[in-house]
Amino acid sequence: MEPAKMAPIKNAPRDALVMAQILKDMGITEYEPRVINQMLEFAFRYVTTILDDAKIYSSHAKKPTVDADDVRLAIQCRADQSFTSPPPRDFLLDIARQKNQTPLPLIKPYAGPRLPPDRYCLTAPNYRLKSLVKKGPNQGRLVPRLSAVSSRPTTPPVAPPQAVSGPNKAATPVSVTSQRFAVQIPPSQSTPAKPAPAATAVQNVLINPSMIGPKNILITTSMVSSQNTATDSNPLKRKHDDDDDNDTM
């Protein structure tokens, strides 16, 4: 450092000159000018703390003024806290010997950094986050939401029943109940005018309720059995066969 920085200023305060002289007497010749200010702040803080402690001790002993014994007691108590010397070497060796007798924890057998368990390291968090959101009774459950459109398949619209007029048999009106629909279909119009008394076959058709709704629909169809149709067509066939035989003769 330059000598101009180490030399105290002549017009400096008296406390600064005294601190510079103390540093010179201790053999400290190289320092920055700000060191004197730091030393003055430390000295002021230390002296005021010692005097405050001495005043407390004097009032506790019920003395009218602070004497030298109170100051010595304050310095002795403050020295144990502020100015501590390192422990002796023998004491440190004894503590190190006792500490080294404790075996180290086993290392986990896995790939990666060979570290002791997490409780002996500072790598794992030692806290747990608490959620502020309170879970309700129904939270976390999946509640199915069904719509009227997706719950049942679409069905084509049913045309209103109409009365069909036949040459032989009049169509019976359609009877509609609350839950069942009875529909009777008359025999086909292609049959000849000559009615043939034959037993009618009844066929019941039950539609799956899941396709239409909660109501069941029963459709009753009255139809002429296939045997009656066969008996009606057989005379015509026989007549044609007889005509063919006459022509050949």
UniProtKB/Swiss-Prot annotation:
Pfam family, one: TFIID-31kDa
Modified residues (Phosphoserine): 147, 175
GO biological process: DNA-templated transcription initiation; negative regulation of apoptotic process; negative regulation of transcription by RNA polymerase II; positive regulation of cell growth; protein stabilization
Modified residues annotated as N-acetylmethionine in this record: 1
Annotated stretches, region: Disordered: 148-171, 224-249
UniProt key word Acetylation: yes
Purpose of the protein: Essential for cell viability. TAF9 and TAF9B are involved in transcriptional activation as well as repression of distinct but overlapping sets of genes. May have a role in gene regulation associated with apoptosis. TAFs are components of the transcription factor IID (TFIID) complex, the TBP-free TAFII complex (TFTC), the PCAF histone acetylase complex and the STAGA transcription coactivator-HAT complex. TFIID or TFTC are essential for the regulation of RNA polymerase II-mediated transcription.
Protein name, entry field: Transcription initiation factor TFIID subunit 9B
The species this protein was found in: Mus musculus
Lineage, opening ranks: Eukaryota, Metazoa, Chordata, Craniata, Vertebrata
